[in-house]
Amino acid sequence: MLFRSKGESDAGPASGIPQPHPYRDGELPDSVRVACASNGGERLDGHFGSCARFLIYQVSPAEARLIAVRPAPTIARLSVDHSVERVSLIADCALLGVLSIGGPAAARVVNSGVHPLKRSEPAEATLFLDELRAVLAGAPPPWLARIVGREPAAVAAA
């Protein structure tokens, strides 16, 4: 049995699993790979440690494309630490969208090179991805500019 955090969808694996679209590396310039913790449909509505799946998107200023759906292992809360296996599912991503993530798991995610971004409420993943696309289209913060291979915008002298 999976335990859900406040706000997490209880839809589970039976709800509609979205279909990924073909993608070849380099096809979307200035893009970043993003994992979203999901329990149902194309929603960002999961806790890192208990979500049913990770939706993997390639996101550029022009497009957010679902490129993979990776089922997460089903675990019981008292099992041996399972965050290592979950981190391996998203290791090729630069960003992780989640409703919540525990401290030790967040440390493992960050140490693997993935930057977790917590959301306060469950929502369609497209809302999160559209916000990210807008940031990429403008002047992203230096850490994000480096991830997509752009020079960080120079800070104007005061």
Where are these regions (language model features)?
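C-terminal binding/interaction regions
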Residues: 114-118, 126-158
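Entry/capping segment at the start of metal-dependent catalytic domains
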Residues: 6, 16-42
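Extended, alpha-helix-rich binding/interface surfaces that flank or overlap catalytic cores
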Residues: 109
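Solvent-exposed alpha-helices and their adjacent loops that cap or buttress functional pockets
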Residues: 25-29, 47, 88-90
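A general sequence property marking short-to-moderate contiguous segments
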Residues: 7-11
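Compact, charge-rich alpha-helical regulatory domains located at protein termini
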Residues: 68-98, 104-106, 115-123, 138-139
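Conserved mixed alpha/beta catalytic, RNA-binding, or beta-rich assembly cores of soluble enzyme
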Residues: 31-81
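Short, small-residue-biased leader/transition segments that mark boundaries at the very start
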Residues: 1-2
